[in-house]
Amino acid sequence: DRPGNIKNGIESINILEIDQTAASIFYRSYKSNFSDTTLATVGDQILLEIKSNEAIQEPSITIASNPAAVVDNGGNNWSASYSMQDGDSDGIIPFEIGVVTDSRGNPNSGVISSTTNSSVVIFDNTKPLLNIVRIISNNSDSTWAKIGDSISVTFKSNELLTQSSASISIESAELTPLSAQKYVAKYLMQSSDVEGDIPFAISFTDSVGLSGDPVSETTNSSNVIFDKTAPILDYVHIESNNSNNTLIAITGDDVFLTFRPINTDPIITDSIIVTIAGQVANLSQNGSDYVGTIAINGAIPGGFLSYTIDFVDRASNPGEQVIVTTDNSYVNHDIVPPSIDSVLIYSSNFDPNWAKSGDTVFVEFFANEQLGSMNINISGRDSSSYSFEGLN
């Protein structure tokens, strides 16, 4: 007391513990309930699991910037969950653990937004797209196809796909991955397939099960036309440039074989081979007509000239070899000079063996073939006229 008297006190049975150390969240792990726990889409649940080194008060946690449902699992273990919504942003799903306060009221240093095991969850609410789609055939002209040709539809997506399928010409196509996001669908054209532009369709699904809009058009305007019909020539005509008769040719004359394909089935000019009398003809084009030409020489046998036309269309379908004209035209190679077999002269006189002034004198003769032109002289004067009667 104040005068200085001392008395020993009694020791208290209560102990006051002073705690000024904040709790630590030493374990943080993140996952979704999707089959791939690193991915999520609308409706998937995101789960954040945390562990503290001591008892804490219920923490405030947001997932995808939205309040999460927090559950105390006991033993300083907590979990927070959130179901992803349509309006949430695509990409890595953020989370935040607010200021954590232990049971004695000590707050930690601030917001926590990362895991301790590098786990992340990516939110995908966007349909996948195909940003490259192309179609070609293995035909010599890749924009055409015939029976047995292979059609390839190559496509590339803007993200990984888990499922995809394709049809070509309304038939199931064989699908092969070329890389992580690139695929090719192939199909062999059949006789039962419909002619024209070859249709295709691609269905595909991304890693979280979102289906893209079916694709049936290319991104580069490519297309392939199926043609299973052999080309046809609807006009074939042969003639010569003989000055007397285009049905006849002699040495020095030219012979022309003119033909025209059906305009709906173009043929490849470089594929055309024309022969006349066994000789390869020179080929030229006049509008939609093709003309094969040879010059007649003495080595070509006499008689009706034979010819062939071979050709293929744009799809490489071969046409049937043409050996006849469409208008029954022909050219006869004449190698025998004309001859006069017999000659008869008479007059219009009562006695045909005599003639007086004013009488008409006739010369009648028989040739071995039809003559084109002739010069007849009677008594030193050119005949005023002549006529053709019969074949001789």
Name these PLM-found stretches.
Residues S52-E58, S157-Q163, P261-T269, A367-S373:
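Short proline/glycine-enriched turn/loop motifs at strand-loop junctions of beta-rich domains
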Residues D1-R2, I10, I61, A80-S103, ...:
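Contiguous beta-strand segments of beta-sheet-rich domains
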Residues F34-T37, E58-D88, E96, T115-T116, ...:
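Extracellular beta-sheet repeat scaffolds used for adhesion and glycan interaction
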Residues F34-D44, S140-D149, N244-D253, N349-D359:
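Short, solvent-exposed loop/linker segments at the N-terminal edge
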Residues S52, W78-A80, V100, P128, ...:
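Extracellular/surface recognition and adhesion modules
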